[in-house]
Amino acid sequence: MSNPTASVRRGARPDLLDPTALSQLGGIEFIAREVVEGFIMGLHRSPHRGFSAEFADHRAYQAGDDLRYIDWRMYGRSDRYHVKQFEEETNLRAYLLLDVSESMGWSSNPSTLPNKLWYAKHLAASIALILLRQGDSVGVAAFHNQIVERMQPKGGRRQWHEIARRIRPLNAEGGTSAEGALRELAMRLQRRGLVILLSDLLVDRDETIRALKFLRHHGHEVLVFHIIDPGERELPPASEARFFDPETNDELLVSVADIRAEYREAVNDALGEWYRDLRPNGIDYEVIDTDRPLSLALRAYMRKRERLG
């Protein structure tokens, strides 16, 4: 078996690795940092307005800036003037809303494919790092039946390490109430910003859509990452399949041949309905399979961020 770490050392971009290889590289901070560095390398920076490799706690000195805030230590290291940047100067406030319900712990092939929560955590950490490097502030809320972890939006290098530390130990457990988490978040957000939902959307559909519309009505930009396992798109190559709901423990045994085409059509219809319900309301919606490189999701995020200026 090839060593994925060796591939990265030979110059392969980590953001283009499949999640199976990526999961062998190390912990969440290392992986997210490697993914983002590879992604930035691929951007060539110039097409992306406002992108900066510096963290939010510093920015380049501009004529008229208060000289009291020049960081002289940084000047000594880089021979360039930088001023200390405070939280209220950041461009955007963003909130990552992470689904940690029991269904997120599922993988169609646990021996080779990371589960949905692993993917969502690493995507969240990668987006958080990009946000902070752009001078934005970012917070996180994790939920199942209720919000179980919350961090207020802040900028700066330390915030990213704290985000990674807080989401790393979260396990997939409990049922899902995205609607409750979204409404609670809307009530707590004091300024308009960007809300990014990362979920498998095994939720009450109508309630969740109403809550997402509620956020848009209050002036927030919303981006939904629908995290799905490729095994949820297609039935396995077997004569029978056992359907199991990890949140209710209900089971159903069926003949695969009898329902394969119908199942595929039902899945595509369900994904299409999410798209048709959300996009006309100004809510960006992206389906992300857990066997795909994280760079695909990062591109979707960057498209959204560029539109916000």
Question: Could you say what each language-model-derived stretch is?
Answer:
Residues 1-155, 194-198, 204, 210, ...:
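An amphipathic, basic-hydrophobic helix/alpha-beta surface used to engage anionic
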Residues 135-136, 219, 282:
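Glycine-centered short loops/turns at secondary-structure junctions
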Residues 149-166, 303-304:
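Short, electropositive alpha-helical surface patch
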Residues 159-193, 205-206, 228-229, 233:
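Von Willebrand factor
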Residues 182-186, 190, 194-198, 202-207, ...:
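C-terminal functional segments of enzyme domains
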Residues 220-228:
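Aromatic-lined glycan-binding groove of carbohydrate-active enzymes
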Residues 236-262:
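Acidic, Ser/Thr-rich peripheral helices and adjacent loops at domain boundaries
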Residues 273-304:
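Conserved, well-ordered alpha-helix/loop/beta-strand core segments that scaffold catalytic motifs
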